[in-house]
Amino acid sequence: MTDRRPKIAALIADAFQEEEYFFPKVALNEAGYDVEVVSSRKEPVEIYSYFTRTGLLDVDRAIMEARPEDYVGVLIPGGARSPALLAEDSRVTTFVQDVSARGGVIACVCRGSLLAARSKVVASRRMTGFNDNASYPELVVQPDAEAAGATWVQDAPVVVDRNLVTSPHPRHSAAFSAAIVEALRGK
């Protein structure tokens, strides 16, 4: 009989930020979790490093094949387009809601926090996310987070509030990844 490792769904679409996926994925794998790439469609998605396309990533499961009860958490990397594209798909936002309602960890970095806000799982929680209003005001997450009932934390490398783990930038990947693992172990 094979031991089954707990699974994390990495919700990813085109133009996701590679550093925000691969660093936490490695940390989660090392901590004993399998990470499955889940997207709206089961087609390869474009990998970006900031605004430069660097390749393609295979998708393990389309959202319609993913069952919330099979996952102990969700990883939502940022990127210029990925979180917004996913937030337009009601199957994805419902999946995030269902995993959260089951007590699963919702971990978002940078603009990934947009998907959590638009999935309505941040009310009455402290959180952070992409906040560089000077350089890219159109990508800032704070208005969506506050509209969804969250309390915005501006200058913190990681914010943990119950099952929600958020970080504003990939430069905090080590602290973010450690916080995800700690939150998962505390479940």
Question: PLM features: what roles do these ranges have?
Answer:
Residues 1-106, 114-124, 134-187:
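Extended, subdomain-level signal for the structured scaffold at the beginning of enzyme domains
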Residues 110:
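Catalytic nucleophile serine of serine hydrolases
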Residues 126-128:
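Beta-strand segments within the central parallel beta-sheet cores of soluble alpha/beta enzyme folds
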Residues 130-132:
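Terminal hydrophobic/aromatic helix or amphipathic segment near a protein terminus
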